[in-house]
């Protein structure tokens, strides 16, 4: 199944909260997830000239602010992070409503999530819908939210999670066979001694 770019929020079997983001693409496969610093992961093209072909292929996909993780499929990552003082729900709702879906040929939804060790909110804005919802994370499970054929937040979109470290989860989600055309993956895990980030590419 092809669901395009997607995020996963959940907990490891040992109960560590995490957020993951995977680029799945048929149109722009030559991209990588690059750790820019201890708090930021960016999606960038391997050929920087491609940045000028499409405004939606280069962006920060994970941003860590103190003990909170923001994950999304576009430039709204940074704006959500800036609005965290609104609270998780309102930061998502405000930024998604203001920025709206991507104005490309596919009317691609913007998807996002915010989580810390205590709670998680997921949200999206599509051309015909907008939603923000608090979800209860379960050990060993992850909610996924994709831009194509999977842009909804419900119990039917839960997958098993394998791995305890950011590296293990990134490898698992990048190679998750049900979702086609993997390109790159980034993961942030909330551990007892801080938030750990890892990236993986094809």
Curated annotation (Swiss-Prot):
Substrates-to-products reaction catalysed: IMP + H2O = 5-formamido-1-(5-phospho-D-ribosyl)imidazole-4-carboxamide
Keywords assigned: Hydrolase, Purine biosynthesis
Pathway noted in the entry: Purine metabolism; IMP biosynthesis via de novo pathway; IMP from 5-formamido-1-(5-phospho-D-ribosyl)imidazole-4-carboxamide: step 1/1
pH note: Optimum pH is 6-8.5.
Summary of temperature dependence: Fully active at 80 degrees Celsius. Gradually loses some activity from 90 to 100 degrees Celsius.
Gene Ontology MF, one: IMP cyclohydrolase activity
GO biological process, alphabetically ordered: 'de novo' IMP biosynthetic process
Enzyme Commission identifier(s): 3.5.4.10
Gene3D superfamilies in alphabetical order: Inosine monophosphate cyclohydrolase-like (3.60.20.20)
InterPro entries for the chain: IMP_cyclohydrolase, IMP_cyclohydrolase-like, IMP_cyclohydrolase-like_sf
Family: Belongs to the archaeal IMP cyclohydrolase family.
Function field: Catalyzes the cyclization of 5-formylamidoimidazole-4-carboxamide ribonucleotide to IMP.
Protein name as catalogued: IMP cyclohydrolase
